[in-house]
């Protein structure tokens, strides 16, 4: 991994695309992502397309993120503007480098004194449990939700699509711990990958909400980005082509509704909304 520290002039990015319907800003403590998921839409964004290094091989650590956040939110508050933050849209705030760098933790510490109105933390990492102490303080001063991506319950499937990301059992156990501490949680099945019939039961008791999203609905281009990333071929190679159906979300929702009330289950964009 090619890592380097960077000094950012801005850390709050005005929300665009599907985030704009509920959020005012996105916040990415890092640029790049060590998890290097094969289906990640960020691979097709300018931040990566103009890089000479492959996605997953480079990382920029925004070492002054907390300081810049404080300045920016103070300016927004002076203008009496709402602040609803999605963290993160183009990286994982709890990827391996965070364990030592502590950039996300420093941001949370700053947010306790300068809170947004709403914060959603989107991650694939069990490292989020390290910061439960801060999250408990933060939820007293702002609306907070921790959303854990659990795109399948099959470790063999995870190894195909995201071999460098944390294991599914580790993620599930971490979210259970966050939920047990009293923090609002969400299981995000995104992008939905082939899973076992027992998947709904395996996530029982670890979340307040479920968000289901697919490569077709969730890549921001109705499947075009996923196609460019070679997902149809990858699904076909491993015998998963039936799971690549553009209407697979309908079957998934109906199946999960056998285990959970429909009021708990959200689809794609609505599942990420505050």
At which residue positions do the language-model features occur?
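Conserved strand-turn element in the central/C-terminal portion of the radical SAM core barrel
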Residues: 164, 174-197, 242
């Amino acid at each position: 991994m090619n890592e380097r520290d960077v000094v950012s002039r801005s850390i709050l990015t005005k929300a665009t695309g599907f985030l704009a319907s509920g959020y005012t800003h996105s916040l990415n403590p890092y640029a790049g992502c060590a998890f290097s998921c094969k289906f990640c839409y960020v691979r097709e964004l300018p931040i990566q397309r103009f890089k000479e290094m492959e996605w997953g091989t480079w990382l920029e650590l925004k070492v002054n993120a907390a300081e810049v956040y404080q300045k920016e939110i103070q300016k927004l508050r002076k203008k009496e503007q709402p602040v609803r933050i999605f963290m993160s849209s183009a990286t994982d705030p709890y990827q391996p480098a965070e364990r030592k760098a502590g950039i996300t933790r420093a941001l949370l510490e700053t947010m306790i004194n300068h809170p947004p109105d709403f914060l959603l933390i989107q991650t694939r990492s069990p490292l989020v449990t390290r910061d439960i102490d801060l999250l408990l303080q933060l939820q007293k001063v702002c609306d907070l939700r921790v959303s854990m991506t659990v795109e399948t319950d099959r470790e063999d499937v995870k190894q195909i699509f995201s071999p460098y990301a944390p294991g599914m059992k580790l993620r599930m156990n971490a979210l259970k711990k966050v939920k047990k501490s009293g923090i609002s949680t969400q299981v995000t099945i995104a992008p939905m990958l082939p899973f076992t019939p027992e998947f709904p039961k395996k996530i029982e008791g670890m979340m307040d909400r479920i968000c289901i999203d697919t490569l077709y609905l969730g890549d921001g281009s109705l499947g075009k980005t996923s196609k460019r990333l070679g997902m149809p071929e990858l699904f076909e190679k491993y015998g998963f082509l039936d799971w690549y159906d553009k209407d697979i979300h309908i079957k998934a929702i109906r199946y999960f509704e056998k285990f959970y009330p429909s009021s708990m289950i959200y689809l794609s964009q609505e599942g990420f909304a505050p």
